[in-house]
Amino acid sequence: MKKMTINDLIKWKQEGRKFATSTAYDASFAQLFESQEMPVLLVGDSLGMVLQGENDTLPVTVDDIVYHTRCVRAGSPNCLLMADMPFMSYATPEQACENAAKLMRAGANMVKIEGGDWLVDTVKMLTERAVPVCAHLGLTPQSVNIFGGYKIQGRDQEKADRMVKDALALQEAGAQIVLLECVPAELAERITKVLDVPVIGIGAGNVTDGQILVMHDMFGISANYMPKFSKNFLAETGDMRKAVAKYIEDVANGVFPDDAHTIA
């Protein structure tokens, strides 16, 4: 696989070519994903739940993400590697720059931050200092205590309009990817069409430019429940490499997610 860049993803969006992405946390699985030409990987703070056994992502530290970013980069030298900025690691633009530098030095190509237009100054500062940003909207797991649980976001018109405005503001500030989690497919389509940057969805229908799954859900090994929008591709194929290949193929062909794995 050739070295992936954000320019490749922008070109794919312009061409209407959909792409699959996954979380990854270690070198072995990163190598597996690269062998199947997975273009983008995310070292997600979901590791707090799937690796550390926590109930949410809040206990994850910057050092945790740095460690796993190094591991994933060792296994996948050519993917576009995103790294999550954990809870309260970007409360101010200055703090965000300090912590993002650690992730970039560990091998990340981009950092992912959760939140709306209050992040505009942070995104601007990061971008001006050569740190690419993925902006995460919708169900942002670090805000679980504000939301009162893991709930679908953007169902009413006012909140949907606000999310569109946030997406545009973050793109204007310099965000190069927007990730939408657990939003109605109609809203995801609206945001995908209005933005010039690639939009990655999870639980947001199949109209986004890309899809992402938590690795453990893809292989059916999550200790907790399986979200409606996830699919166990290993059960269908019986082989991890084939499962990854099937996921990539189904996303590229618009087969996944289907209605059964889409939030109305």
Curated annotation (Swiss-Prot):
Binding, Mg(2+): 45, 84, 114
HAMAP family: PanB
First and last residue of the signal peptide: none
Protein name: 3-methyl-2-oxobutanoate hydroxymethyltransferase
Record's cofactor remark: Binds 1 Mg(2+) ion per subunit.
UniProt cross-references to NCBIfam families, sorted A to Z: panB, PRK00311.1
Cofactor: Mg(2+)
GO cellular component, one term: cytoplasm
Catalytic activity: 3-methyl-2-oxobutanoate + (6R)-5,10-methylene-5,6,7,8-tetrahydrofolate + H2O = 2-dehydropantoate + (6S)-5,6,7,8-tetrahydrofolate
Gene giving rise to this polypeptide: panB
Keyword Magnesium: yes
Quaternary structure and partners: Homodecamer; pentamer of dimers.
Main location: cytoplasm
Gene3D superfamilies: Phosphoenolpyruvate-binding domains
